[in-house]
């Protein structure tokens, strides 16, 4: 089943380009059409139940929505206030996120500006992928793994089509709705909204494990390809139940990548020697067969992973292209039908 993109596509070089309108079977839902934003609420609409986490941007609380009665998640983000007040760019960027309405992206329901804090109200999900991986005794395989990755790539493509780059995809930023058997990307767009420098993104060492090599080498372009690399690392982790690359420093992370994929050269990655943190004295490792790292994946799965972990970000497979890969042939039609039902098609 061939599926087309309706209003935007991530090109091979990481740029975005418009495409002609497509037929009814489209990866990009009608939510791409700009929706009017609702007014923000006041803080007393939400009652805190408990603190459930603390991430790159602030504290996360489980809350009760006193208006709707539903359980929601509140991210409380402190803002740097200068003489001009709260930065309008942060509020504007976050407001754009409210237009996202996709079954595989955690929905931003409300934005509340309170004193020097921005309260972001999201749909509440009980568990993240990191927690599920810790609970499981076996890796994800077969149709289950295909469905998870297809859903994540659908969500990723939706956001890239809107020119949002996540920059911090990892298992703890992938939430799970077990009742509906879906996974959802969380925290999309917040890196751009709050201008968080990627090199000092978080004190969590684990974030390094999913970071693209061009970022580790000092590239500041932040193409959508950085998310595809991170998603490839998640893909491998699901298939093997442990991280593919697990360095405890930026240089150790690079060397972990080099030891499996080989030390990149101008022949394998044009322009790599010009990146700020490249060193001509890097150890020279020869690439190993990728299958040795992910023996549970079939040939199609290994091929998809290889394309997601392509060194050159301009040659790395895009989320859109990955969705067309033969690895997903047995689940694509069912998943696209689910997406179309969500869109009311």
Swiss-Prot record:
Listed PROSITE patterns: PROTEIN_KINASE_ATP (PS00107), PROTEIN_KINASE_DOM (PS50011), PROTEIN_KINASE_ST (PS00108)
Q: Which GO terms describe its biological process?
A: G1/S transition of mitotic cell cycle; regulation of G2/M transition of mitotic cell cycle; regulation of gene expression; signal transduction
One GO cellular component from the entry? cyclin-dependent protein kinase holoenzyme complex
**What GO MF annotations does this protein's record show?**
ATP binding; cyclin binding; cyclin-dependent protein serine/threonine kinase activity; protein serine kinase activity
Keyword Phosphoprotein listed: yes
- Enumerate the UniProt keywords alphabetically: ATP-binding, Kinase, Nucleotide-binding, Phosphoprotein, Serine/threonine-protein kinase, Transferase
- Which residues constitute the catalytic centre? 168
Pfam families in alphabetical order = Pkinase
Location of Phosphotyrosine modifications = 57
Annotated ranges, domain Protein kinase: 46-328
Q: Which residues carry this modification: Phosphoserine?
A: 56
Name-wise, this protein is Cell division control protein 2 homolog 2
